[in-house]
C-alpha cells in the first residue's frame, strides 16, 4: 500500500445525517465502504456487491486494491488504528447479525427505517416487499445508483419532523421485519419513543423490530468515536441503559428477544477485531 492510501484514510471524518445532503451522503458512504471492503475478504461475513456503487471515486480505488488480501488487511488495520472503538467492525458485525435475524423471521414484508445505502432489498434473494424510509437527500442519491424494482417502495421522510404513522398511512398491516440500523443515537428521545409506538400500530402482532442503539453511559464518554461525531456537529443525542431496555420496550408494546453489543456480535462470528461494547443491536417482537 502506497503513501496515498495513508493520506486518504487519515483525512476521514465520520459524519452522520443532519438534514444536509452532504452529511447525509457521507454517512451512508462510509458504511457502504466498510461493507464493500468486507465483501472483498476471503472470509467475508456477507457479500454486498452493491456497496461499491454508492462510493465516490476516492473510495472505489481502495476497494479495488482490497481485492489483494494483504492490502485489504492493511486498509482495515489503518481504519481501526485511526478510529479506535471499532466503527468498522461494529458496522460489519451488525450487518451480518441483522441479515441472520431477518432470514430467521421469514416476514411477509420488510420495513427499512433510515435505510441509507442498505442493499438488502437488492442483494437478498427472495426478499419480500420492502419499504425503505429515509431522508429525501440520501434516498435520492441511492436511487441514482440502483434500479427501481417492483418489490421496493421508497418513502421519503425525516423522523425528527414527521411521524412514521403519518408517512406510512397506507402501509399494509402484515407480519413485518423492521430494520432500524444506525439511526436511533442521532434522533431525539421523543422521535425514538414516537417511532416505536407507531411501529406497534402499523405492523401486525408477531412482527420483529431490529434496532441499534448506544449504551447511554457512552453519551458522556470521551471516546474517540464520540468525539469525532461531536466535532463535526453531530453528537449522539439518544441512548439506553441495556438493563432498562426490556422495560422500555414493554411500555411500548414490544417484548425483547435479544440484545448484543457489537463486540459480542463480532465474537459470535469469530472475528477478533475491534468492535464496540457500547454499540448494541437489539431485537423485539410486537405483541
Where are these predicted regions, by residue range?
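Rossmann-like AdoMet
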Residues: 11-111, 117-157, 170
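Short amphipathic alpha-helix with an adjacent loop that forms part of the alpha/beta core around
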Residues: 163-172
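A short, conserved alpha-helix within the catalytic core of class I
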Residues: 164, 186-198
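A short SAM/SAH-binding and catalytic strip from SAM-dependent methyltransferases
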Residues: 175-191
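Conserved beta-strand signature within the Rossmann-like core of class I S-adenosyl-L-methionine
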Residues: 203-216
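Short, glycine-/aromatic-enriched active-site segment of Class I SAM-dependent methyltransferases
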Residues: 220-235
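Short alpha-helix
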Residues: 237-259
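Core SAM-dependent methyltransferase catalytic element
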Residues: 268-287
Amino acid at each position: 500500500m502506497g503513501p496515498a492510501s495513508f493520506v486518504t484514510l487519515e483525512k476521514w471524518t465520520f459524519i452522520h445525517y443532519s438534514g444536509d445532503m452532504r452529511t447525509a451522503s457521507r454517512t451512508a458512504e462510509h458504511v457502504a465502504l466498510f461493507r464493500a471492503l468486507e465483501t472483498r475478504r476471503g472470509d467475508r461475513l456477507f457479500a454486498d456487491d452493491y456497496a461499491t456503487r454508492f462510493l465516490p471515486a476516492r473510495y472505489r480505488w481502495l476497494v479495488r486494491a482490497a481485492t489483494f488480501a494483504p492490502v485489504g488487511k492493511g486498509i482495515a488495520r489503518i481504519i481501526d488504528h485511526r478510529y479506535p472503538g471499532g466503527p468498522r467492525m461494529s458496522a460489519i458485525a451488525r450487518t451480518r447479525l441483522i441479515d441472520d435475524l431477518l432470514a430467521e423471521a421469514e416476514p411477509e414484508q420488510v420495513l427499512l427505517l433510515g435505510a441509507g445505502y442498505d442493499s438488502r432489498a437488492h442483494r437478498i434473494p427472495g426478499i419480500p416487499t420492502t419499504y425503505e424510509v429515509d431522508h429525501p437527500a440520501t434516498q435520492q442519491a441511492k436511487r441514482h445508483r440502483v434500479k427501481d424494482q417492483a418489490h421496493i417502495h421508497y418513502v421519503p421522510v425525516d423522523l425528527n419532523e414527521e411521524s412514521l404513522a403519518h408517512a406510512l398511512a397506507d402501509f399494509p398491516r402484515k407480519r413485518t421485519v423492521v430494520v432500524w440500523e444506525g439511526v436511533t443515537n442521532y434522533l431525539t428521545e421523543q422521535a425514538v419513543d414516537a417511532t416505536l409506538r407507531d411501529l406497534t400500530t402499523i405492523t401486525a402482532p408477531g412482527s420483529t423490530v431490529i434496532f441499534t442503539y448506544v449504551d447511554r453511559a457512552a453519551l458522556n464518554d470521551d471516546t474517540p468515536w464520540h468525539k469525532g461525531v461531536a466535532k463535526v456537529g453531530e453528537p449522539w443525542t439518544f441512548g439506553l441503559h441495556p438493563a432498562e431496555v426490556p422495560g422500555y420496550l414493554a411500555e411500548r408494546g414490544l417484548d425483547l428477544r435479544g440484545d448484543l453489543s457489537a463486540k459480542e456480535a463480532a465474537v459470535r462470528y469469530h472475528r477478533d477485531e475491534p468492535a464496540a461494547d457500547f454499540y448494541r443491536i437489539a431485537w423485539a417482537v410486537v405483541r
